[in-house]
Each structure stands twice: as structure tokens, then as C-alpha cells.
Amino acid sequence: MSNSNIHPTSIIAEGAKLGKNVKVGPYCIIGPEVILHDNVELKSHVVIEGITEIGESTVIYPFASIGQPPQILKYNNERSNTIIGSNNIIREYVTVQAGSQGGGMITRIGNNNLFMVGVHIGHDCKIGNNVVFANYVSLAGHIEVEDYVIIGGLSAVHQYARIGKHSMIGGLSPVGADVIPFGLASGKRAVLEGLNLVGMNRKGFDKAESLNALKIVQEIFLGEGNFADRIKQAQEKYKNNTIVMQIIDFLEHGSNRSFCSFEKTMSLRGELQSNLTKQPN
């Protein structure tokens, strides 16, 4: 790599590995066990430490901090990892912290993600592909976020929670439980408001199947009887609805947290959402 791509004010420790066409702007610090793959760009004032790997064509903006130790009292200088995939955009003041002994020693982020200003990703988080975290989203430790998730600004997610694929969480919404795939959740204590029908339509999901899935999800969460029995009944009855089956699979493989559910008053919004989408174009 040509040294002309590295600003003279930046500090790159001996042992760091930089791929082809890596660009390092002013006042960056890169630790000795960092790997930057081809075409990575650090704008300026970026700090990357620890055993950290950044995938191809990821762009990191000023004052981001990647790979620092986890914010936990029991951390004892274990050698943990941070792995970030390709084509990510990591904006100003984003923090991504390394894994811990209690979570497999690794924080992992996939490809094609956008993390806006001030996002915090805690230790041992597992982030998928094509997610968008708006400004100042904060994830505690051990959180799993699946593909195509959108989280609105200033929202926070409780440790060990899971956020299912294609779901959307509104801004200013603390999430204390698992959010089902395709779910739409928000509120001062986030509740399930329905399914992310707009996002599903944009991704090409069948409209009729999506609307039917919304009704089935309401049956599962708001119906009578035992919750586990309602899941089993829906699994047998609606096995041809691929959206529902993905949601049921998520429910059957739950974490130790509860599921983000409808409030009784919020079920009316789900019904309204369903009715509105039935209106002619």
C-alpha cells in the first residue's frame, strides 16, 4: 500500500495489517492486532484497537471508537474480538466494543449496514446484514439483530434481547423484550403494534400473505388459551404462510427474555393497519 494514503499525523502500530487502497485520514490510531481489508477508509480521528477486523470498503467517520474493551466490571483483560464485515458505513461517534468471556469473546457485525451518529453497540452483540440504526441507538450486551432491521433514533435495547429480521422499531422506544421478525414496535416501553407492512411491501413480500400474517400474529398474541398452544395451532394451521412460519420459528427458539407483545389497546391499531392496507390504490 502506498504511504500517500496514510496521513502523517496518524499512528499505525507495528503489526497492524492494511489491505490495498486503505485510506487513513488525520489523527487516527490503529492498534497492533487490527486488520483493515481492501478499500477501507478512516476519515479522521478514528480509534481502532484490540483484535479487530474491518471488512472491505467499510467507511468509518470521525471520532468513532472500534474494538475497545467491554464496559463490564468483571472484564479482566481477556483477549476478545471485534469483527465487522464489508461495505458498512459507520458514522461519527459510533462505539463498537469487543466481546467478553460471557458471550463467546466476540462482537460481530455483518455487511452493508448503516450506523448513524452516536450509535453504541455493546459487547458480544451479533448484528446481521442490511440493518439501519438511526442516531444514538444504543444496544446493551449480547443482543442479536437479524437482517434488514431498522431501529429509530434514540432507541435502546435491553441486554440479551433478539430483534427479528425485517422488523422496525420506532424512535425513542426502549425495547425490553424480543421483537418478532417483521414486527413493528414502538412506545415509551416498546410494544408490538403490528407488522412492518410498508417495509415488507418494499422488499417484495406478497401483500395478501403479509396481511394474512398480521391477522395470524394477532391470533397468536391476543387469542384465548395457552400461548404455547396457540403457537402450535398456528404452526399446524398456517404452514403454507412462509412469513408466519418464520415468526413461529423465532418464537419457538426464544431467549430468556419475554416477547414484545400487543397491549390490548394497541390491537386496535393493528386492526386499523390491516383495514387501511385493504383500501383500493
Curated annotation (Swiss-Prot):
Name of the top EC class for this enzyme: transferase
Catalytic activity from the UniProt record: a (3R)-hydroxyacyl-[ACP] + UDP-N-acetyl-alpha-D-glucosamine = a UDP-3-O-[(3R)-3-hydroxyacyl]-N-acetyl-alpha-D-glucosamine + holo-[ACP]
One GO MF term attached to the UniProt entry: acyl-[acyl-carrier-protein]-UDP-N-acetylglucosamine O-acyltransferase activity
GO cellular component: cytoplasm; membrane
Major location category of this protein: cytoplasm
Gene3D superfamilies referenced in this protein's UniProt entry, alphabetically: Hexapeptide repeat proteins, Udp N-acetylglucosamine O-acyltransferase, C-terminal domain
Record bears the keyword Cytoplasm: yes
Pfam families membership: Acetyltransf_11, Hexapep
Pathway participation: Glycolipid biosynthesis; lipid IV(A) biosynthesis; lipid IV(A) from (3R)-3-hydroxytetradecanoyl-[acyl-carrier-protein] and UDP-N-acetyl-alpha-D-glucosamine: step 1/6
GO terms classed as biological process: lipid A biosynthetic process
Cellular localisation: Cytoplasm
Stored CDD domains: LbH_UDP-GlcNAc_AT
Family classification: Belongs to the transferase hexapeptide repeat family. LpxA subfamily.
Protein name in UniProt: Acyl-[acyl-carrier-protein]--UDP-N-acetylglucosamine O-acyltransferase
Protein species of origin: Rickettsia bellii (strain OSU 85-389)
